[in-house]
């Protein structure tokens, strides 16, 4: 596994807590997706399971390190329920069985829960009992992608570690070294993905990037012809919800431009479109457009029986009126 540069400091900080015997037995890592948190946990675990660690580094040569590198260490336990994608009481029973058995390599044991929000209420209650007073040398790593909704008692039983986003400049340097896109494209992808560098890389290398560009190209042509219905086939094809999000992000950028906040634009590769909306329409009309698109998105995502093409047609006709392409 390769390091991500923004994980080096968090790794060393947590390892040093273990070196000083100050580490909590349960670390709850608060982060967002696209940060490589699994690698962070894996490297920390490899150090904990290393038989001959060298300072903050694992030796990468002992039997424990070789087992980790082969993803076959008997004392590394990732708890995943593949049946229904949730952690229920049965999942916690598996944990309970693991922690009260002697470590097969005679040292530490690692319990990794990749997403605590998949825990059912009964599973949380069962886990709380385990975390209250677990056997020695059992180390729990829990990942949380939505801290606001997390069980308060579960938070209190863990050491909370917030994994910070890397600086934008640092992420851009990493993206530059890991793909062939230009700086403006990388910056746009990074901001679309809430500054998560790995998500930005995956997005810009996927078909979604081309779909986004095609949507804006089609929108530009339809604006020129004052006929927004031309983008209907593009919207209906696939990823409709995501495409509505892209339209809203573009409109938000126009609002920011009207407030002279150009440094915070998301769609840095669509300045021409942003300028069209910001110069042609005030924020009242832009906000009205965003609200109508948001309502359309909500209906599409919550009403399974809806005729999506008909709804989008209605939305585009309404948007034409808002933008004064047709008279009401």
Curated annotation (Swiss-Prot):
GO molecular function, one term: DNA-directed DNA polymerase activity
Enzyme Commission number, as recorded: 2.7.7.7
Catalytic activity line of the entry: DNA(n) + a 2'-deoxyribonucleoside 5'-triphosphate = DNA(n+1) + diphosphate
UniProt GO cellular component terms: DNA polymerase III complex
This protein's UniProt keywords: DNA replication, DNA-directed DNA polymerase, Nucleotidyltransferase, Transferase
GO BP term, example: DNA-templated DNA replication
InterPro entries in UniProt: DNA_pol3_clamp-load_cplx_C, DNA_pol_III_delta_C, DNA_Rep/Repair_Clamp_Loader, P-loop_NTPase
Domain of life: Bacteria
Primary role: DNA polymerase III is a complex, multichain enzyme responsible for most of the replicative synthesis in bacteria. This DNA polymerase also exhibits 3' to 5' exonuclease activity.
Subunit structure: DNA polymerase III contains a core (composed of alpha, epsilon and theta chains) that associates with a tau subunit. This core dimerizes to form the POLIII' complex. PolIII' associates with the gamma complex (composed of gamma, delta, delta', psi and chi chains) and with the beta chain to form the complete DNA polymerase III complex.
Protein name as it appears in the record: DNA polymerase III subunit delta'
Origin species: Buchnera aphidicola subsp. Schizaphis graminum (strain Sg)
Gene name for this UniProt entry: holB
């Amino acid at each position: 596994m390769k390091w991500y540069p923004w994980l080096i400091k968090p790794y060393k900080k947590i390892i040093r807590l273990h070196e000083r015997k100050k580490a909590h037995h349960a670390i709850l890592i608060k982060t967002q997706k696209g940060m490589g948190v699994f690698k962070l946990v894996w490297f920390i675990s490899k150090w904990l399971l290393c038989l001959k660690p060298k300072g903050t580094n694992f030796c990468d040569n002992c039997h424990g390190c070789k087992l980790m590198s082969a993803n076959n260490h008997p004392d590394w336990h990732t708890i995943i329920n593949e049946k229904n994608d949730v952690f229920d009481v049965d999942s916690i029973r598996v944990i309970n069985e693991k922690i009260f058995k002697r470590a097969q390599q005679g040292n530490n044991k690692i319990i990794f829960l990749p997403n605590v929000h998949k825990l059912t209420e009964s599973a949380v209650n069962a886990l709380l009992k385990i975390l209250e007073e677990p056997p020695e040398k059992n180390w729990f790593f829990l990942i949380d992608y939505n801290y606001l909704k997390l069980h308060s008692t579960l938070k209190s039983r863990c050491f909370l570690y917030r994994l910070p986003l890397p600086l934008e400049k640092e992420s851009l340097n990493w993206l530059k070294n890991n793909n062939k896109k230009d700086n403006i494209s990388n910056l746009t992808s990074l901001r679309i993905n809430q500054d998560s560098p790995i998500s930005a890389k995956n997005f810009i290398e996927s078909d979604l990037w081309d779909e986004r560009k095609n949507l804006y190209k089609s929108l530009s042509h339809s604006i020129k012809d004052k006929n927004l219905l031309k983008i209907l086939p593009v919207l209906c094809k696939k990823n409709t919800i995501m495409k509505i999000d892209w339209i809203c992000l573009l409109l938000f950028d126009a609002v920011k431009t009207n407030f002279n906040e150009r440094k915070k634009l998301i769609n840095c590769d669509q300045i021409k479109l942003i300028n069209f909306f910001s110069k042609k329409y005030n924020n009242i009309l832009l906000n009205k457009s965003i609200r109508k698109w948001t309502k359309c998105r909500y209906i599409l995502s919550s009403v399974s029986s809806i005729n999506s093409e008909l709804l989008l047609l209605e939305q585009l006709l309404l948007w034409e009126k808002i933008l004064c392409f047709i008279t009401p």
